Design a protein with these regions (language model features):
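Basic/aromatic recognition patch in beta-strand/loop cores that engages polyanionic ligands
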Residues: 48-78
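Enriched for short, Lys/Arg-rich terminal
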Residues: 66, 74-98
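Basic, Lys/Arg-enriched alpha-helical interface segments
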Residues: 1-56, 60
Length: 98
């Protein structure tokens, strides 16, 4: 099984998402973060479940979508995936770490 490593950038994104939603509803904020984490967990059994990120031309940088959020990840090897960032579709796409 593949290990998921949430990079600091992705953890920061989760906190920002939580804080933004929690301004209206802490219950829904917790629910949204839980859904994002559950969606990412499918990568443990299928690293290639996501599609290639259109902003980058690499088979190893992929995304899975949950609602308006794109979970961007990099396949490091057959045992490790880095979750790089969580991107809301309405926002400008940031540069990825090299």
């Amino acid at each position: 099984m593949v290990k998921l490593l949430w990079l600091i950038s992705a953890k920061d994104d989760l906190k920002e998402i939580y804080d933004f939603i929690a301004a209206d509803s802490t219950k829904y904020a917790r629910h949204q973060i839980k859904q994002i984490r559950q969606r990412a967990n499918i990568l443990k059994s299928n690293a290639y479940a996501g599609k290639i990120v259109r902003e980058y031309d690499s088979d190893l940088i992929r995304e899975i979508v949950i609602g308006h959020y794109r979970i961007i990840y990099r396949i490091i090897n057959d045992k490790l995936i880095h979750i790089i960032l969580i991107h809301h579709g309405a926002r400008r796409f940031p540069r990825l770490l090299k």
